């Protein structure tokens, strides 16, 4: 089948232009004004924005954590992603300490293959470093994994500085990229012990035990290690101005550093933790925690200046019943928020319509840059001949109110409940097939695993 999208405005990382898009099978054949080649079906998209399918390079589906499992598996999570305009996710394969990378990869394929409705790939988590893990790294590249993750916090997952140095040296050999969760674990643990001794174990203590300067310190330490190795790294879910200053300082030294942030750090502030209603406060517990309003401003300015390259979600969803496990002890609240279903509309509303960022910037941080950074460009992330026909049809005038009752994710709340978005996703096409129409997910669990190459950003 050939489809001709006629009369829309095509968005790219360079700007916008009025153009038609001709699609055949899974691929885009042509993008241009007044395409005359015949099509089996003409789709009138007059007045619509046509954006490349969004890429969420930071999700946690079907993850065992805090003695429970995330509410969204690969089926429900990918359905929610598609509804939000995301046609590709890159999830984290997470072997436990003592397990091989091969075991982690096989486990995540069992979780995702034949169950995922959008296209998908995996980052590989390195939570240990030894000769076996080092020997397996080359096999990961052969399996289509070109990006990795390490933690500077969480004892069950973290690496010390020595291990991080040696792991980064190994990744440098083949041009791999590594994202790092940056928080100072030792001081966080000390602050938690102080709160326990004081009997202050309510939700409001969560952000006070993970302050911004402990994130900034870890960012600084990571970047000095990366400088010693001479390798670019990704600061995942960067939340605040202090951490951002460390990134800027490294760039001034000549380092190549990439930064990611998330909608919760752009739209919410830490007052959410002060709500006396436990349920209303606990739902926002995540790590790093949501920061202050002035940090929001710094992040938006960094996006505008091109200092933050991607906006992902860190989608890690739990039900309110799961969140209830931390009553009386905030450290037992499973940390994470849902986000894949609302990211595009929120960023358009809070960023583009307020002129904090341009439409081209939105396209770069949601689609083009993650495609380049994680080795999927130009197959993904751009609307041009030869690319996958992943298309988001966005009506900039159709307002939408976010409500948990309407969600397709497997959660019973939404962090952005009651937010009115300006504009709405009307259709989502995945490799030339209509996957979502007017909020209804049509796609089945036939997403493709994407073999990814090297970073080209």
Model-flagged regions — what are they?
Residues 8, 325-329, 385-451:
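C-terminal cap of metal-dependent C-N hydrolases
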Residues 203-230, 284, 304-305, 309-311, ...:
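His/Asp/Glu-enriched, well-ordered alpha-helical/loop segment
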Residues 1-53:
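Histidine-rich, glycine-flanked metal-binding segment
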Residues 86-90, 116-121, 146-147, 225-233, ...:
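Short, surface-exposed connector motifs at secondary-structure boundaries
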Residues 132-311:
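Histidine/acidic residue-rich metal-binding segments in metalloenzymes
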Residues 8, 21, 26, 47, ...:
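Divalent metal-coordination and catalytic microenvironments
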Residues 45-115, 132:
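Metal-associated gating/positioning segment near the N- to mid-region
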Residues 102-118, 166-180:
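Alpha-helix-loop-beta-strand connector modules within alpha/beta enzyme cores
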